[in-house]
Amino acid sequence: MMSKQEFLGALYNGLSGLPKEDIENSVQFYSEMIDDRMDEGMTENEALEDIGSVNEIIQQILSESSLPKLVKRTVSTSDFVTHTYTVEDDFTNIIIEDAESNINFYKSNDDKCRVLCDEREKVTHTVVNENNTLTVRVKDERNWFERINIGFFIADMRVSVYLPKNKYDSLNAASMSGDIDVANEFTFDNAKVGSISGDVSVKADVKQELNISSTSGDVYAENLNLEKFNAESTSGDVIINNISATECINASSVSGEIDLSNVKGKEIFANTISGGVMLADTVASQKLKANSTSGEIDLKRCDAKNIVLDTVSGEISGTLLSNKQFITETTSGTVNVPQCISNEECRITTVSGDIYIKIADQ
């Protein structure tokens, strides 16, 4: 049975002949369908079974994908204007939802909140402060065919949020095709930041839980001390630097690379299907698990009480900080690991890849 990530990856690859935006919208749609079923109490496997065969879904989407011929046009900065919305009252929660704008957060220099939105014909925004929550949403009144930008040059539109305080309770920011950048001047208790085709970068301090995601863009986070952290991308890279979590750290991608550097946590999981996994100075107090189907796994000065490394055709190599009881399995690869006696276990499995592990400073 496929996992959710494998299902979305197969869907993404199966629709490769369609426009990029159509692919990403389809992937996002089915991702939300799976999540909705799991919210209703289904397991991941039950949700996937209820949705149906990914191959049948691909064929259905392809059969319905005929589009009218479009007239080529150019959208430049002269086609939109920047409107400034001033927010008078205080708030502690922030919700930003847009379709194609880049979203950026800045510290206000005059203790006032302002939201600057690039807008054009039929594309405006609503900015509301209610129930202690600042909500910014795009209002797109275009017809569906006006939103398809095949072969066009599209200038970047922006939503710039200037915040007067450094500390807020929650942040929820989402864009369809824009990049999202959360600067390091701010602190949130919880944050959820995601884009379908844009890159996502979070440098702000998050105290409890941070979730960042992108379907085809890269996701990046650094300099965090928090409880839980989750980062995922379908075809983009996941890059995590200088992060410490008291609970779980999870990084996943279907075809992108996973790069963790100076990462500490109780449990750390790095999972990709066709990309590589690179872990440097990554230490879990309990469990460290990394797996890739066809990519390599490379470790530099990593450690945990329990380590699980798994590939099908990729090589597994690197250095650990302390002795382990090594349990290795490979069908056709070469195995070279230290002969150690330890109560801590490192289990390494590959089908056709080689295994080369050393203990640092030995």
Predicted regions and their residues:
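Intrinsically disordered, low-complexity terminal regions
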Residues: 1-362
